[in-house]
Amino acid sequence: MIPFTAQYLLVCGYVILLGVILLERSGYSAFGLLEKRQDYFHNSHAIMLSSRQDLGVSGPALYELFEKHLLDAYRIPGRYPGGISTLYDTFSEYVFKGTSHENCSVETSAVAKLTRDVTPLPIHSHNDYWRDVPLLKGLAYGSVSTEADVWVHPHKDHPYNSSTDKLEDYVLAVGHDEDYIDPLRKTLEKLYTDPLQSLLEGVNCGKSNNSKTQKNGVFYTANHIPLFFYIDFKSDDNILTYKLLLEKYFTQLIQAGYLTYYDMDTGKIIQGQVTVIMTGNYPNNTDVLDNGKADGYFGDRKRYLLQDANLLELNEESAKMAVTASTSLSEILKMVGSSNLKVIMRGHLDKEEITAIKKYIDNAHSFDLKTRIWGVPSWPRKTMKRLWKQQIEDLNSDFLNVDDLKAAAMF
């Protein structure tokens, strides 16, 4: 028989446990350490997002602060109806809150909030659109290169006919697989071009397209460094994709003078704050690129969408309209008589492989192109980091193709 004192303590324990469960279900934090969860989030959210409020951290520290401390926010339904996610919406709202082109200051800009303490790194944010916070997370970790896979999708239900429809009838949805795209919420405009426009406007107060003053880029401490933006053409109709990019999605960035372009008169690449690079199923016929005109798509003797050349088939002609050259590790190893399996089993590139691969890298550099090797194994982690080091130190490649931003930033 249980003594009375033990029975009393047991009953008290059950009562306390029941109380904790009821508090959790009603939204209150266990043991009353925090106020009601939803109110706590809303109140702290309101404090963080008050006009021009600055949390005092930027870069990875800022992103990780939101990522860790918004865990309970996922339990709050409908915080941002129609938004991307609670994390994305809250983070981007903080970054852009209180910033505008009309009343802007570099010190209080979105760029300052996001990248004030960030050192730009030779990192390409691979499959960036898969990240919880596309574009902004990569910038916070110092990635100087990002990418978006785009699919043509009709605005509404009607037969697909690019010859009769208007451009406004279509959107470019962002995603790796067409079956999983979200053409309402996850478009190129919402995830990339609009945020880029806002970032750049906030640090280029009063600078017009015709201004001779050098415009600032997206990195606060290195405003001369451009962002490389790969657009991977996924849809079969690459001509419609190309037209949408120029006439809808990049129009404002072009008009503001932010895009890198190819000068048809001098044959040179003129650097801007954002360098847009076509990859995948993109058109390369000059009639398409220039819209059938002798003086360029917009009649200004400029081409704004540049190309990613094949690193393994590079020549003077293919390099002319390119700014980068890329290939996969498996393809370049095949060209030099090796394979991914051999490298993984060994844990690194050997001297013969390095010598043979470096010839391709050096060839690209002779055309003033930056290089990227994708498809580098991400496991074992030791092998991944060894290959990162060899790409930088031995091959002198320009961009590391990275999935794990935190690991690369700490590398």
Curated annotation (Swiss-Prot):
Annotated signal sequence range: 1-29
Disulfide bonds: none
InterPro entries, alphabetized: HAT_RTT109-like, PLC-like_Pdiesterase_TIM-brl
Keywords: Signal
Molecular function GO terms recorded: phosphoric diester hydrolase activity
Gene Ontology BP term (one): lipid metabolic process
Similarity section: Belongs to the AIM6 family.
PANTHER family named in the record: ALTERED INHERITANCE OF MITOCHONDRIA PROTEIN 6
Name assigned to this protein: Altered inheritance of mitochondria protein 6
Species annotation: Candida glabrata (strain ATCC 2001 / BCRC 20586 / JCM 3761 / NBRC 0622 / NRRL Y-65 / CBS 138) (Yeast)
